[in-house]
Amino acid sequence: MDERKLKYDIGVITPYKAQKDLLTSRLQVKKKYKAYSIDIGTVDSFQGSDRDIIIYDCVRAAQQNRKAKIDFIADEKRLNVSLSRAKKLLIIVGDMKFLYQAQCSDANNPFVRIIECINKNKESYEIVEMGGRNAR
């Protein structure tokens, strides 16, 4: 297949502006990504638009046994925007264990349902564990 015909619009969604700015600056210096149509934005900036491929960067991760609340990223309306913008492929980047165990003010952590759905439907979804600074 001709690789030139495999051009996809890619969106990277993150809840926080500071993370958006960091990702934007990192991708701008990588010349190998200039051939791709990549838009990086916050959840709010993707409201009403979609892309072939969406990468949702949850940002949050465990920090030395600290019980963190994830209310901002767990807001169901914002999460709905983040997870419903992909036409062909959705990639969620995050610390799965942390997101599963994190607390929300209303005791309703939507990531529990998302992760359980992924685990129950392994023929449709894939979890890839990657090393990193917070990997255990």
Question: Residue spans of the language-model regions?
Answer:
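Helicase C-terminal subdomain and adjacent C-terminal extension
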Residues: 27, 63-136
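Feature representing long, continuous alpha-helical segments
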Residues: 17, 21, 25, 41, ...
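Conserved ATP-binding/catalytic motifs of P-loop helicase motor domains
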Residues: 16-20, 47-48, 100
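Conserved RecA-like helicase motor-core motifs
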Residues: 9-11, 28-42
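Conserved helicase/translocase motor-coupling segment
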Residues: 1-25
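A short beta-strand element within the Helicase C-terminal
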Residues: 41, 45-61, 81, 89-93
